[in-house]
């Protein structure tokens, strides 16, 4: 049985991928790591700063790791505020993981993003192979990361694989500084019976994906026959092409008194306007059977059910369309 390390395990993807990996491969075979200190007695978690090369190599060697899911990164909006930190975390961390993988013979997963594209890229049906000229430091690190993974694959034989993920919607992880976090915030506001003020314009269309589809795609790619993978690294995957207004309308079908306002933040709006509205995922479908299960309606039902289970049922005033006197901005 493979021995797995997840870096950035407490982040947006890691919070759901780590338990999914443990369900598939057994908890004892999956080591989680992040910057937070380990809790006493937790043998399946270790503190790790991925910018420290010796620490990365030591953990991989000591735990006899076969596969690294390298998720540690600063997300788009945070990265724009801290570009030097973003380069250090996103690039040095990946380099250290790839170097350790070269030394110890590990397989590596690296999550790329729609941020790897820019305003000169075709925005609808963005092809697998196309121009990549991002305008954010986050996007620059994703393109550079794709190329670095390709280099380690061709030069050193490291089995590095990756996906270009759309904006991700998670019922588990709180918003973490991403440009598409508005969707998560919107669902959470609805469950809390709050009016929501969206930081993107109402008609900003972007490719999005529900996290259960993303974690399944990640695991399926890593199990795929390498002989069938034309690209290995940075496959386009897609979930749904939606706008904030469309998500709000779908939520309102379940919570009639939910309402959203739209006051675009210049920084995040500019980032969103440079990203694809939809991705062409035909290569992923053909090479390893990528098939998302959640459209907007299914995602909305599942998100609200999960968030309600965590926080309590909807208020009757929402369920029956009666305005909530305590509504405010989320």
Predicted regions and their residues:
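N-terminal Rossmann NAD(P)H-binding glycine-rich loop of SDR-like oxidoreductase domains
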Residues: 4-23
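NAD(P)H-binding glycine-rich loop region in Rossmannoid oxidoreductase-like domains
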Residues: 50-89
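NAD(P)-cofactor binding segment of oxidoreductase domains
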Residues: 62, 81-108
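A conserved pocket-lining segment of Rossmann-fold NAD(P)-dependent short-chain dehydrogenase/reductase
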Residues: 80, 131, 165-175, 185-209, ...
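Conserved Rossmann-fold NAD(P)-dependent oxidoreductase catalytic core, especially the SDR/UDP-sugar
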Residues: 95-137
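Conserved beta-loop-beta element that borders a ligand/cofactor-binding pocket
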Residues: 113, 147-172
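Glycine/proline-rich active-site loop of Rossmann-fold NAD(P)-dependent oxidoreductases
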Residues: 143, 156, 169-184, 211-212, ...
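C-terminal substrate-binding subdomain of Rossmann-fold SDR/epimerase-dehydratase oxidoreductases
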Residues: 199-201, 207-321, 325-329
